């Protein structure tokens, strides 16, 4: 890892505030992760995740706070490792680590503290399995994705994206103390959804990735293969998302919601593919709708699952 050049560092008189440390945790990214965690808790409990209102509320607070700290810790270490390339990308140049506002040492102390507190909270007030699932997600994101795959292969998102699949397992394990087939489906849905979401983003900022040498799919194999892969993974996502209905884990509320949400995901993926197949470049304006909708798709799909299992349990 290279250090930040002196010319890009902030004046020594400028001190980091709590907002700068909050920015290290990537709060905007974490919001969707926490949503899948919380909705998974309702799915696992088939309703309110507690024997009483207060016990359920306490568990929701513990898992949400601990989940934020664990995911935030992963974001901190991601910024430490990637500070050299973050400085060269417009989207990330202002991050506290790449700008020199927060040193790598202080960031590492902050990130480690968050992770330790998260693990202890989940172990004591959740379940040991929830604590281990949270730690596994952290290790996968920081070590497997950021440290190993991100700079070496265009499969980085396919494999490394599994880190984002752990939050629903954390929520499920916090409620039940174990994992079952339906929890595995939640993991798999996010696994196949991730390339759709992040390759749409990669199309939008591919030139920045190219400049810093990150082998994202559109950089390595071009727009046409990227949109084809997006379409393929969109199909996988929609088909897999509807399979729990067949096994009786959910019923018509989830099925209708999943089918409608999935149909629009497939349509936007097809529109993007058709645009590129016609010989036009995958410009930002044609990738943005899919990128934004993919987040809404996942959020509403998990909400539908929580409502279905609560109402029709």
Curated annotation (Swiss-Prot):
How does the protein associate with the membrane? Answer: Multi-pass membrane protein
Please give the Pfam families that the UniProt record associates with this protein: UbiA
Q: Cellular location of this protein?
A: Cell membrane
Molecular function as annotated in GO: protoheme IX farnesyltransferase activity
Its Enzyme Commission number?
A: 2.5.1.141
Main location as per UniProt:
membrane
Arranged from A to Z, the UniProt key words for this protein are: Cell membrane, Heme biosynthesis, Membrane, Transferase, Transmembrane, Transmembrane helix
Q: Which Gene Ontology BP annotations are present? A: heme biosynthetic process; heme O biosynthetic process
TM spans (from-to):
29-49, 57-77, 101-123, 124-144, 157-177, 185-205, 225-245, 247-267, 287-307
Q: Which GO terms describe its cellular component?
A: plasma membrane
Under catalytic activity, the entry for this protein gives: heme b + (2E,6E)-farnesyl diphosphate + H2O = Fe(II)-heme o + diphosphate
Q: Which family does it belong to?
A: Belongs to the UbiA prenyltransferase family. Protoheme IX farnesyltransferase subfamily.
* PANTHER family referenced in this protein's UniProt entry, alphabetically: 4-HYDROXYBENZOATE SOLANESYLTRANSFERASE, PROTOHEME IX FARNESYLTRANSFERASE, MITOCHONDRIAL
**Note in the entry:** Carbon 2 of the heme B porphyrin ring is defined according to the Fischer nomenclature.
Role description: Converts heme B (protoheme IX) to heme O by substitution of the vinyl group on carbon 2 of heme B porphyrin ring with a hydroxyethyl farnesyl side group.
Protein known as? Protoheme IX farnesyltransferase
